[in-house]
Amino acid sequence: MLEIVVEGTVGAGKTALVEILEKEKGMTGFYEMSDDLADAILERYYADKSRWCLTMELYFLHKRFLQVRSANQTHKAVMDRSMMGDLVFVRMQKQLGFLQPIEYKVYESFFRTMSEISPTPRLLIYIKCSVKTALERIEKRGRAYEINVEKSYWEQLCQFYDEAFMEFHNGNVLIINGDEIDFVENESDRALVLDAIDRCVNLKGVHVLNSGSLVCKLD
């Protein structure tokens, strides 16, 4: 069963949290997808973004949909990013001019249909952090293709993530304050997060985890 989905901007700590849940809770992690066809499409996309953007995003959406179905048939599954996260990047592509409005409508029609027939996780975790925090973590892990991206791109991405989250979240939600909480380096923060996850899986509504406190957030 798909227990948990972890969302957040690039550098928020999604993959790190999934790895922690695998190690500490015995969950099965589902990570970013890659295969030969995806690599071939990406290569063409970087050579001609406007030509290959829709092809790339539809292929990734299809792969994510299959991944969600597979996760739902797996005991204690946790996913690194969801179709909502994919939509964030598609909206960015449209904003940057690589996806035409009519192409976006095509993508959105597929997205809506697949979302409606996809299982809802028991808990959605959204790691919310500032651009400053995300950039510090991006620089720390040292991926050249991320470091060379202009700050304005990451600012837009954070904004799109916040907007998409407010639009699509439903069910049980845990928002982790990624600026205050460091569950990677700080053991007490990690314990705090794991305890909050255990509690929120069985709690209804939206909850926010700040440093030292878990509070209920009214919609």
Protein language model features and the residues they cover:
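P-loop (Walker A) phosphate-binding loop of NTP-binding proteins
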Residues: T9
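NTP-dependent small-molecule kinase module
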Residues: E136-V149, Y153-D219
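Post-Walker A alpha-helix
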Residues: L17-V18
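Hydrophobic anchor at the beta1->P-loop junction of P-loop NTPases
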Residues: V6
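A glycine- and Lys/Arg-enriched "phosphate-lid" helix/loop adjacent to the NTP-binding pocket
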Residues: F89-F160
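A basic- and aromatic-enriched beta-loop-alpha substructure that forms the phosphate/nucleotide-
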Residues: R64-I102, I125
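Conserved lysine of the Walker
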Residues: K14
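Conserved substrate/cofactor phosphate-moiety recognition/catalytic segment
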Residues: K23-K63
